[in-house]
Amino acid sequence: MSNQDIEEIPIRDSMIRLGQLLKLASLVEDGVEAAELIRNGLVKVNGGIEDRRGRQLHNGDTVTVNGQTVKVVAPEA
């Protein structure tokens, strides 16, 4: 996968929770769908399967769902 395939998702704060990012990036319709995908092991954070919907994501973290990868871009401190 090349960097062109990774969509950057800007966030307002220095951190966002996984479930929130999935909705913000339009990878899921709602929190129920996010929870289901995470529970079924279909969400990867930085290349590893993540099972916590509340996982904190920071600048540079990547999330992959259904072959689509997004990258968290936080504002500079």
Report residues per predicted region.
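A detector for short, charged/polar N-terminal pre-domain segments
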Residues: 2-14
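Generic structural motif recognizing short loop/turn segments at the entrances and edges of beta-strands
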Residues: 5-7, 41, 68-69
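A basic, amphipathic helix-loop patch mediating RNA/tRNA/ribosome contacts
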Residues: 16-59
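C-terminal structural segments of small proteins and small subunits
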Residues: 52-77
